[in-house]
UniProtKB/Swiss-Prot annotation:
Major place of residence: cytoplasm
Residues that hold Mg(2+) according to the record: 19
Entry binding sites for ATP: 17, 168-170, 234-235, 243, 249-250, 266, 270
Pfam families recorded: S-AdoMet_synt_C, S-AdoMet_synt_M, S-AdoMet_synt_N
Keywords per UniProt: ATP-binding, Cytoplasm, Magnesium, Metal-binding, Nucleotide-binding, One-carbon metabolism, Potassium, Transferase
Amino-acid positions noted as binding L-methionine in the UniProt annotation, renumbered to this chain: 58, 101, 243, 274
Protein name per the record: S-adenosylmethionine synthase
Cofactor-binding details, from the entry: Binds 2 divalent ions per subunit. Binds 1 potassium ion per subunit.
Gene that encodes the chain: metK
Subcellular location: Cytoplasm
Amino acid sequence: MEMKDYIFTSESVSEGHPDKVADQVSDAILDAILTQDKRARVACETLVTTGMAVIAGEITTTAVVDYPKVVRETIKEIGYNDSAMGFDWETCAVLVSIDKQSPDISQGVTEGEGMFKEQGAGDQGLMFGYACNETPELMPMTIMYSHRLTQKLAEVRKNGTLDFLRPDSKSQVSIQYVDDRPVRVDTVVISSQHTPEVSYETIKEGIIEEVVKKIIPVELMDDKTRFLINPTGRFVIGGPMGDCGLTGRKIIVDSYGGHGAHGGGAFSGKDPSKVDRSAAYMGRYVAKNLVAAGLCERCEVQVAYAIGVAEPVSVMVDTAGTGKIPSARIAEIIREVFDLRPRAIIEQLDLLRPIYRKTAAYGHFGRELPEFTWERTDKIDIIRQKAGI
């Protein structure tokens, strides 16, 4: 059989990237509302551009929230604190245009209303969960290192190690795979916004020494590994001044970095009655437990819903030929072990908490924080028992 030898690439963006600023603002508003009202319906979209943030969407809640204050606090924490950057938390305009959720949607989602009395899905759609055994977190290696690089960029910016950095940055990691196993890092790309006076050599040396070499293990690099640092040579104008930012524009960064499939629905700004978010988290929980239980080395789970209907219309699993038992049996085990109805997902993963701002930068998956309940592997024993392994 022919040996598979290829290079796969994933990217990440930092908390200061304009699309990520928008995601974090949307989720900060969601958290502020959930703190007061767990039954709120929230669909909050954010646009950020030079000197301005626009908040729009459909929100039905009893909570009283100072939206402009939440927006400004979020922008301040990210680090846009100087109008020389083209975006400043104190002086930017904040426009708010919020409507209520449509009663036609509400009756399908609210328990006891609509054609089906159970809490139904907030929309139709398909969602995917993914896990693989490339890293201890059971995530693809390319996306994990991409996220760690952007996190490290933010860390050295905020603690003053590289005080010439500004909030907007991106990373990209290309890894060589042989027979679907990661063997070496081929290319690392980092672009980071910086102050105007710093030299290119200072930026390049600082990022390679304080970021790349602190994150990428030496055993994964060789003399052919390339570091492309700010390859245009200059990145002073960035953030919302450089590019308009919108909620939901970084869905692959948010998930698995191009590994597996994606149903197209974004996460940020949505309360967990929206299956775009809650069912994607559940898909990760299912896939991670199946891989952790040893049923497969790689696992992709698809679930699909109809608006207003609680039970998923389909559940599919694909192990890419790595399954210890047939995929049809794994799909049955998923149905037996995991309750995939929207209300049950919310209860199992305890999703009515103000935890979402934390998810909105550096990936929704693979970070084993206490709030990220979908990263637990607490179903291993029952899965193994049912699989007979």
